[in-house]
Amino acid sequence: MEKYNFKQIEEKWQNEWKSKKLFKVKPKKNKKKYYVLEMFPYPSGKLHMGHVRNYTLGDVIARFKYSNGFNVLHPMGWDSFGLPAENAARENNVHPKEWILKNIDTMKAQLKKMGFSYDWNRELSTSDKNYYHHEQKIFLEFYKKGLVYKKSTHVNWDPVEECVLANEQVIDGKGWRSGASVEKKLMPQWFLKITKYAQDLEQSLKDLKFWPEQVKTMQKNWIGKSKGLRINFSLDNKEKNIEVFTTRPDTLFGASFIALASEHPISKEYTKKNKEVENFVKKCQENLNLQEEEFEKLEKIGIKLPFNVIHPVTKEKIPVYIANFIIMEYGSGAVFGCPAHDQRDFDFAKKYSLNIKQVIKPYENIKLEKAYTGDGKLINSDFLNGLNVKEAKEKISKFLIKKKQAKTKIIYRLKDWSISRQRYWGCPIPIMYLKDGTAVPATDKDLPVTLPDDIDFSKSQNPLKDHPKWKYTKYSKTGEDALRETETFDTFFESSWYFARFCSPNSKDIIEKKEAKYWLPVDQYIGGIEHAILHLLYSRFFTRALHDCGLLNIKEPFDNLLTQGMVCHKTFKDEKGDWVSPVDFDEKKNKEKFLIGKSEKMSKSKKNVVDPDLILNKFGADTARLFMLSDSPPEKNLEWTDTGIKGAYKYLNRLWDLVTKNLNILSKEKKCSSKCTVKKASFI
């Protein structure tokens, strides 16, 4: 009996698929399409087991759909711009392009060895000018639509990467990649108006029937819809008024002060009139450089302005402060303080001996030693007395709106997307500056704006800024001298539309409409839940923006979303406390010399990774794929064990033996071997 020779078998069938061009696909009117896509990888050098699991899940779905008569699109490409390539260039004295291309060759060979059903004719790389040429066109389309603008703002600055981060790239006050504590810095930045789509992005989440609830909840919370009122408080002895935003109009009768942001127009007005106010405002604006967590921990302080406002119902006079805990970006930059029912207001009122008036009584008799923020019955609130919080909100809102003292208002936590990055290895922003400083978009004749190859990383973190020639150009419309924008796109720009480019990767158009109409949306998308807010939200925004530019006929990019679990492995430390690779651990021989830690996500830093090449060479691709599919549900973490992979290998051997022993029963033809041929290659 012939033994299970996985190398011979896998090589045979992979060559068969290649020669028959089995996975090459094009639109077919008489066949129903199915588009399977796994999040494409950054070409870091080698595949890891997380990749293997992700791509195995996608591959089995693709093959299943093909076997059920679908016309299956299953592409692969490379998210190849980004900081790691630039850092590698600095450390190893190699050009980022060279480093990336070498890594792509290595990883592509690994993927082919795994036997995945990719249509390699559609392969794309985001650092290829044929890709980012069209990306620059997209930027200019967005520019025409008014979705692009530039302004100076306090941005998230990663001191390690020396680069700006979007709000979504700051996790618990630290850079998502470097882990460094992020600082705030005032800088001019290019932005995309994702906030224009905030309402649609939030409301449409309910239509994503086949997305994990956890992902939808994360996006909903990040978009952060708040429904409230804008209430007018008139200034005493003046015709002006202060517009205050609140989500708690039920507490209006407990208002004892108004707090303004340091950037509020009235704050700026009094800065010019009073030196003490000017100094306080400067101090407040320094605090804007802090991360959100640090900002919240600040002592709540303020400075009183020389006027009051009139309460819209009771007509009582209420003092006005500039306060360090109010920001202009939220609401109207002004709030009314109700100390009894907001802890921040409570702390402020205590400090400045302001009135603390309770207007909500808890259902249970409890002693209030701090602000009460729960439900209850309204007290000390005139015509609201006896109502619960919800009823009180509705009644006071109707009252104020009828009196034309308030308007309903919906605001969102979501901020516009900062896309400027102070790095070389990214897509150049197609903007140039004329002598008078005017920013003008590049014309079609100017595209693509390509990166220079002759760069010097020794001078600064951004070689484009210091390049002796590259930044100097001509504005093609007038022929006058101009300077190129020396910043590049956030790399999430590239990954926000690649799924659409896969439909026609070689087209001269940004997106070939006929192909896109046939293939999109993606029927099954697969990737980690860590991308819930970043990539997945940006892709939803891009799809809407591309739709509004007339480039797509869909608004949602992905019908079904599978967020696969991580591949985990036990961790090991030696007697010194240093991480040790599982390869160096032998439980029978030297268990006493090692500390066995908990199972964690595979990572190079903890040395608990398993090299896919070792598994492929020892057990074969089918064994690796079988283990990835059989040991844990796709959404759950998969525990990597030697016994598990060996068990999958033994199972395939038994399956091979079962079939080869009974070939005379299964087929009338003579005994088949791994060297036999078939009349037609099969997708599965």
Model-derived features with residue positions:
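Non-catalytic terminal extensions that flank enzyme cores
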Residues: 1-46, 189, 201, 214-226, ...
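Conserved oxyanion/phosphate-binding beta-strand-loop segments in alpha/beta enzyme cores
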Residues: 1-37, 66-75, 98-108, 210, ...
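Residue patterns forming the tRNA-binding/recognition surfaces of aminoacyl-tRNA synthetases
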Residues: 3, 12, 16-20, 91-242, ...
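Amphipathic alpha-helical
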Residues: 14, 194-226, 261-303, 444-475
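Short, solvent-exposed turn/loop segments enriched in Gly/Ser/Thr/Pro and often Arg
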Residues: 29-31, 40, 75-84, 123-131, ...
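Conserved active-site neighborhood of enzyme catalytic/cofactor-binding cores
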Residues: 42-73, 171-176, 253, 329-361, ...
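Catalytic alpha/beta core of large soluble enzyme barrels
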Residues: 58, 71, 264-368
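Conserved catalytic alpha/beta cores of large enzymes that bind or transform nucleotide phosphates
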Residues: 281-306, 359-364, 383-390, 394-402, ...
